[in-house]
């Protein structure tokens, strides 16, 4: 493949990534769950709901969430467990669903987990230099934190970002068997991403009657340095307000936002009463944002 370490870093900002060897998506999700449970200072048995955002499940069925439930030893507990596939927006979608479920459930485990290396063509420079495997998780509970959400989608009729799957239509047409590799039209993705990331941030700011000056940190989907820097430039915001760890992990799809949030917390970049925006985009096409206001809207 015609590439180099220098080319990858200059074009993407990514200098290292992690690739699972024997671990499945549920294994990574389980490890992230243990850390989230410890950080939340709750017991495993306190969990009422498990939502896993992934586009690389261990298998078609059962869901990865049910596999995580079993790994946590919670099969004898009443658990509402399910997966969603919002691609790289998946964690945001799961987070927003979880926040709506808090009126009925007390503790919700939300996980973004991917072993995206399974669906990468390692001879395709447009994708194989970008993606890595990983998982991140959060526990959502009731409290004074105010949340503002925005989510949207546009059916990808132009095959801008997709991976083939099972299709009766394809079978009837006697097409070649699917490779299941992820395919991406890079320039189209770039233009779409810059547009909708800015749009999504502006939506949650308008809902909350806040401005970027009121926001302590923006945690974007860790897709590409150039995408994030262009969004900051278009919004006339200093790039330092956008947290990035893609240089270390690459694009981990649905796992990127919870991994970045956890790292930002550990680095002391999220004040106890801080305001944080999570924003992302992905295949679908999907996109959205959540503003977390730890000042309780005050």
Regions found by a protein language model. Give the residues of each.
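A contiguous, well-structured pocket-lining segment that forms one wall/lid of small-molecule binding clefts
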Residues: 177-246
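Claisen-condensing/thiolase-fold acyl-transfer catalytic domains that form or cleave C-C bonds
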Residues: 26, 30-33, 37, 56-57, ...
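Condensing-enzyme catalytic core mediating Claisen C-C bond formation in acyl metabolism
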Residues: 1-22, 124-191, 195, 199, ...
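Glycine/charged-rich beta-loop-alpha catalytic/anionic-binding loops adjacent to active sites
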Residues: 14-15, 46-51, 72-85, 117-123, ...
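Flexible, glycine-rich active-site loops centered on histidine and acidic residues
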Residues: 105-135
């Amino acid at each position: 493949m015609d590439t180099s370490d220098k080319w990858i870093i200059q074009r993407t900002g990514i200098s290292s990534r992690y690739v699972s060897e024997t671990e499945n998506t549920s294994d990574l999700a389980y490890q992230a769950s243990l850390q989230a449970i410890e950080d939340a200072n709750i017991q495993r048995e306190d969990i009422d709901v498990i939502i896993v955002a992934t586009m690389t499940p261990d298998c078609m069925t059962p869901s990865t969430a049910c596999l995580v439930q079993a790994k946590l030893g919670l099969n004898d507990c009443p658990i509402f467990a399910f997966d969603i596939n919002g691609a790289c927006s998946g964690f945001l979608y799961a987070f927003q669903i979880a926040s709506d479920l808090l009126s009925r459930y007390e503790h919700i485990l939300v996980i973004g987990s991917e072993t995206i290396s399974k669906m990468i063509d390692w001879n395709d420079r447009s994708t194989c230099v970008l993606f890595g495997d990983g998982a991140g998780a959060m526990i959502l509970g009731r409290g004074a934190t105010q949340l503002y959400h925005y989510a949207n989608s546009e059916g990808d009729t132009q095959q801008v970002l997709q991976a083939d799957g099972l299709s009766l239509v394809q079978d009837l047409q006697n097409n070649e068997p699917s490779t299941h590799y992820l395919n991406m039209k890079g320039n189209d993705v770039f233009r779409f991403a810059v547009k909708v990331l800015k749009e999504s941030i502006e939506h949650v700011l308008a809902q909350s009657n806040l401005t970027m000056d009121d926001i302590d940190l923006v945690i974007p989907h860790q897709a590409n340095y150039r995408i994030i820097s262009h969004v900051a430039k278009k919004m006339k915001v200093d790039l330092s307000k956008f947290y990035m760890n893609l240089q270390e992990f690459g694009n981990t799809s649905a796992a990127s936002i919870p991994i970045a949030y956890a790292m930002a917390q550990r680095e002391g970049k999220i004040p106890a009463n801080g305001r944080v925006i999570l924003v992302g985009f992905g295949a679908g096409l999907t996109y959205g944002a959540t503003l977390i206001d730890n000042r309780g809207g005050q």
